[in-house]
């Protein structure tokens, strides 16, 4: 008898694997999954997201319970996909990549069905789309089962000498909040007195009156998860690191499809150090701003 438990880490977020590599340990890997399927359609097909996927896959492979790891590659209606960037990572670590993109796009081009048959929009599969996706996974597993006598069934520890294709930029990635003062310390809360929560992003900092908040953050790379809202009240914040202007972040999503958490990398370097970080709302007409969490690596 086999007991199966599904551990899901999906949320109403964007910039997928960038947030995913920071959330993975807390929201997925602590459950010690035996099989990990990684899927991120919101990634771009570029070096940044290749580096995010590199660190995420490596983090999964390094787990003590030696899980099986694979990448599932989706598609948009226009055929765009981060597949090329993700494939480089899959090949570097010799893990399977199953391509929904390669399965459906040739069939659509051949006229066997339309995109509308498998999706209600330009990205997300409907029930029929998910049936195709599931069939690709079951076919892959079934092929292993059919050839089980020739398969090495021993779970081996990951060889840590394996070269990371992009240098494991986001090694030890984690989430910073009010509860992690060892890496994120609020030095001057200012007007950001609200304790924010959105889905699993808890213990953040928010203001409804504009103003400034200051931190000391110990990291090599720093990113911000902030709250995009459709109510027209969230505005623009300027971010400084060690006194230097590094980012302007606009949390206004007026007339958009809904509120969501968005991430942006604001600082990167080669060494871990403690930095002063200052966030100031600069739009007096739209004084709301929520820092849901910090992305630390």
Report the location of each language-model feature.
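Single conserved hydrophobic/aromatic residue that forms the stacking wall/gate
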Residues: 2-8, 13
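Solvent-exposed, flexible loop/coil residues
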Residues: 6, 122, 127, 174, ...
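Glycan-recognition and processing domains
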Residues: 146-216, 227
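Short coil/turn motif common to extracellular beta-sandwich-like domains
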Residues: 217-221
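Extended, polar beta-sheet/loop recognition surfaces of beta-rich domains
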Residues: 285-297
């Amino acid at each position: 008898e086999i007991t199966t438990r599904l551990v899901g880490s999906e949320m109403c977020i964007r910039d997928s694997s960038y947030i995913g590599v920071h959330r993975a340990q807390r929201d997925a890997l602590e459950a010690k999954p035996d099989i990990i399927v990684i899927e991120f359609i919101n990634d771009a097909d570029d070096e940044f997201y290749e580096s995010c996927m590199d660190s995420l896959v490596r983090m999964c492979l390094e787990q003590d319970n030696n899980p099986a790891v694979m990448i599932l590659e989706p598609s948009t209606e226009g055929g765009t996909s981060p597949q090329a960037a993700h494939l480089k990572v899959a090949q570097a670590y010799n893990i399977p990549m199953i391509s929904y993109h390669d399965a459906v796009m040739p069939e659509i081009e051949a006229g066997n069905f339309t995109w509308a048959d498998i999706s209600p929009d330009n990205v997300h599969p409907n029930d029929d789309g998910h049936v195709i996706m599931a069939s690709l996974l079951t076919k892959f597993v079934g092929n292993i089962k059919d050839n089980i006598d020739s398969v090495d069934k021993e779970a081996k520890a990951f060889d840590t000498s394996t070269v990371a294709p992009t240098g494991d930029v986001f090694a030890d990635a984690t989430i910073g909040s009010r509860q992690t003062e060892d890496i994120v310390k609020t030095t001057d809360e200012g007007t950001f007195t609200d304790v924010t929560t959105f889905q699993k992003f808890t213990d953040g900092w928010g203001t409804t009156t504009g103003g400034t908040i200051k931190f000391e953050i110990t990291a090599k790379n720093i990113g911000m998860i902030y709250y995009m809202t459709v109510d027209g009240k969230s505005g623009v914040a300027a971010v400084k690191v060690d006194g230097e202007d590094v980012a302007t972040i606009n949390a206004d999503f007026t007339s958009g499809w809904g509120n969501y958490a968005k991430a942006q990398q604001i600082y990167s370097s080669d060494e871990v150090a403690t930095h002063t970080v200052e966030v100031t709302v600069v739009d007096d007409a739209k004084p709301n701003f929520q820092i849901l969490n910090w992305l630390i690596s």
